[in-house]
């Protein structure tokens, strides 16, 4: 009985610690050291909020760069954030990827099937990834330039300016935030 009581006390102490104090400590750390104080990075265009730069959004028009597909509900639903849990041997998953490749090629007829970046047809683990690699952005330059009536060089220059380097030059890889890139495109068209 003594052991059971000790175990219950320890369990209760850990429950309180991890459900209250641990979360509070992380929140305080984010408020002090985190980017944007641990809050969403709100993106604006012409003074209007157009989204959060740290959550992916669906772009389907040819005048915009596209992000990765989302497995989070219909169109980047943050309440459904999760991976699809479908593996490369799942026929339904393979059919989805094939359909995404076909759609991508319809909008990028200058590409060969083998040149479609895998990341543009597969969802990220959260289904809400706001970033793509520079390669994925460069693959879309021609389509976006044609749709906007700009030269490829103009659009490529905007992509070049939008590339974010790895944290401290070491952690992670180069990336392009799709929402920020599309905002930069809109601002350049003025």
Model feature map: region roles:
Residues 1-4, 189-190:
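Short, Lys/Arg-enriched, disordered terminal segments
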Residues 139-190:
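Extracytoplasmic/periplasmic C-terminal soluble domains
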Residues 3-18:
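Aromatic-residue-lined binding/catalytic grooves and analogous aromatic/hydrophobic interfacial grooves
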Residues 6, 19, 26-147, 163-166:
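Flexible, solvent-exposed loop/hinge segments and secondary-structure transition points
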């Amino acid at each position: 009985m003594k052991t059971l009581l000790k175990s219950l006390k320890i369990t209760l102490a850990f429950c309180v610690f991890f459900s209250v104090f641990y979360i509070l400590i992380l929140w305080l750390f984010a408020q002090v050291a985190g980017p944007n104080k641990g809050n969403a990075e709100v993106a604006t265009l012409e003074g209007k909020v157009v989204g959060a730069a740290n959550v992916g959004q669906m772009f389907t028009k040819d005048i915009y760069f596209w992000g990765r597909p989302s497995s989070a509900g219909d169109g980047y639903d943050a309440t459904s954030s999760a991976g699809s849990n479908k593996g490369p041997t799942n026929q339904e998953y393979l059919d989805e990827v094939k359909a995404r490749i076909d759609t991508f090629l319809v909008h990028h007829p200058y590409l060969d099937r083998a040149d479609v970046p895998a990341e543009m047809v597969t969802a990220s683990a959260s289904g809400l990834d706001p970033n793509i690699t520079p390669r994925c952005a460069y693959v879309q330059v021609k389509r976006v330039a044609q749709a906007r009536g700009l030269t490829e060089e103009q659009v490529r220059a905007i992509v070049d300016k939008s590339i974010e380097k790895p944290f401290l030059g070491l952690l992670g890889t180069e990336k392009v935030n799709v929402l920020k890139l599309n905002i930069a495109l809109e601002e350049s068209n003025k």
